[in-house]
Amino acid sequence: MVLARRGVPDAGTLVLTLACIVGAAGGSAVLNTVLDERMDERMPRLSRRVTLLRSAGRGRVAAAGIAAVGAALAVSATRLNLVVCVLLAAAAGGYAVLYTLVWKRRSPYGTVLGAVPGALPVLIGYAAVTPRLGIDGVILFLFLVLWQPPHFWALALRHQEEYRAAGVPVLPVAFGEPYTKVLIFLYAAALPPLSLLLWALGFLSPFFGWSALVLGAGFLAVYYRETVARRRYGRAFAASIVYLVCVMLALLADILLA
């Protein structure tokens, strides 16, 4: 939203957009929990989620998830604009239906496809400010699409035995650790150049360009060390979060402090 506005968006639009994103994302996550119940009960780190689901009642939980998504779509259509509504529907449906029921269960590359609905909040925020999606918004969207697979694959490497027991064909289970590490690094290596496009195409200043360059170099060094050299996948997972947050903070600082 800040990128689209080139400044702070008005409070009303900001609150409504965040409420719609939280409602749609939360509702989709709830539906994902219901649909993944049998899979999750075979994974120790997610078993408590199944216990809570059953104690609350599957029907009530599913109804709450559908209601949250429906409310988000209704508010976005009436108070924001139809582009936001369509993107919200694509994000919620893509995650709760396509990713949960199809991509994750059938393909080792489900994470790559699932990254699209996961990154749509970037375009949703942009469209809330202006329905005409700009190239800068598309670049940021693609950055989030490419960021998610290596982020998740680090987690999948750490918990690959749980995924194997649950029958989820994540990349390490389907193709092994060496292949997964190669893809992790290829995706990670694409992130710094993509972020630099925001400076190279004139959307942001040299401050962001230098920040993105330094952050990208540090991220790649840490990611290689933790995934390839030391096999500390939990740290690699955390490092990707820190990298994303720092890039977004650099973007905000570049615009708001200019």
List the model feature ranges, each with a label.
Residues 37, 41-86, 176-199:
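Multi-pass membrane catalytic core of lipid/isoprenoid biosynthesis enzymes
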Residues 217-247:
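Interfacial loop-to-transmembrane junctions
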Residues 2-18, 73-86, 122-144, 196-208, ...:
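Helix-coil boundary and interhelical linker segments in multi-pass alpha-helical membrane proteins
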Residues 8-10, 115-161, 177-179, 183:
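Functional transmembrane core segments of multi-pass inner-membrane proteins
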